[in-house]
Amino acid sequence: MSYSTSQIRNVALAGHPGAGKTTLFEALLHAGGALQTAGSIERGSTVSDFDPIEKERGHSLDAAIASTDHLASSGQQIHLNLIDTPGYPDFRGPALGALAAVETVAIVVDADIGIAHGTRRMLEYAKQ
């Protein structure tokens, strides 16, 4: 299916390590129908953490992109390009590259720890 630019949204998920970016990525893809079942970090079955080292360590090393469709409240079909970004500072390069490619950054905050240092850093980068 082809989409007009007005129907496309490019969204990066960013935040502190372990905040839930990959889990949200999986849930959004599942809700949009792109995945039959949302993957799990614990099971090593996520779409975005496909590298064996990512599965072993339980966190993202690189940014990953996947797409799904969403019916907006206006009735317009929206095509979402979602980018799951790594949270650890050692892998911040791919996250910053993703921020440059999107018009929207969703900052994911861990409800247990609140706004952490990595959250603040990514928020500042997103503002640039």
Regions found by a protein language model. Give the residues of each.
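P-loop NTPase switch module centered on the Walker A-proximal segment
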Residues: 1-96, 100-101, 105-109, 113-115
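Amphipathic helical hotspot of TIR/SEFIR-family domains
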Residues: 114-128
